[in-house]
């Protein structure tokens, strides 16, 4: 089991984001895995071997460069009842903001257990999005340094606005998920779209303020996409064998 998980971790870390969720979730089963866990690990390894997906880095002019980030959070599916959160940060062309198709380059991805004990799915979703935007700010700052040697990181909240990031979230359907997951996922989107935090717990409301601040510093906005169209979904749950 340790050997299989080690291979999964190495492959996903070096350039196979489709296996990052499996690797992280299976690693949380140690040091007391079950036979079912071993079966899941072997199935995950077979999927990676059978699906060799290249990561393309597209040539996008600096003046047309933008970012898009996909994020997702699960509910109590890791050891100890913690949530799994994950995100993918991609480079794209600015025309994606107007609904047009755009070439996309995966720059950064991450899947891990939520280190915070969250009392609601809304807080899990908010924590995942906040972390995704933090990595997006890091990428945007790196791009700013590449474009201008005089880039002042102390003014990144102003200079990064030209990136105009798009942050996408999902509202899960009810296939195998409880009603709370559906409601809270939509609640995050609703709370980001309005000024008042209707029904939001205080910690989640504070995290939403952080998200709004990150979106403002990146000149960004949040959008909603269906569960089955979110590429970050595979980062937060084990796929079926």
What are these regions (language model features)?
Residues 3-13, 21-28, 69, 75, ...:
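Contiguous, well-ordered alpha-helical segments that form the cores/surfaces of helical PPI scaffolds
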């Amino acid at each position: 089991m340790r050997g299989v998980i080690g291979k999964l971790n190495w492959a996903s870390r070096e350039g196979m984001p489709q296996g990052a969720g499996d690797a992280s979730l299976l690693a949380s089963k140690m040091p007391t895995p079950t036979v079912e866990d071993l079966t899941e690990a072997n199935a995950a390894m077979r999927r990676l071997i059978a699906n060799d997906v290249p990561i393309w880095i597209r040539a996008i002019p600096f003046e047309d460069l933008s970012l898009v980030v996909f994020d997702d959070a699960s509910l109590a599916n890791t050891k100890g009842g913690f949530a799994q959160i994950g995100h993918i940060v991609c480079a794209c062309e600015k025309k994606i903001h107007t609904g047009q198709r755009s070439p996309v380059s995966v720059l950064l991805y991450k899947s891990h257990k939520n280190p915070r004990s969250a009392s609601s799915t809304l807080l899990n979703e908010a924590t995942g999005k906040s972390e995704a935007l933090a990595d997006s700010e890091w990428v945007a700052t790196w791009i700013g340094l590449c474009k201008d040697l005089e880039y002042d990181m102390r003014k990144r909240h102003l200079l990064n606005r030209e990136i105009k990031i798009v942050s996408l979230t999902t509202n899960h359907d009810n296939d195998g998920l409880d009603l709370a997951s559906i409601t809270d996922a939509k609640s995050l989107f609703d709370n980001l779209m309005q000024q008042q935090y209707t029904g939001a717990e205080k910690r989640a409301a504070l995290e939403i303020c952080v998200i709004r601040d990150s979106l403002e510093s990146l000149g960004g906005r949040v959008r909603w996409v269906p569960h089955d169209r979110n590429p970050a979904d595979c980062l937060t749950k084990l796929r079926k064998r």
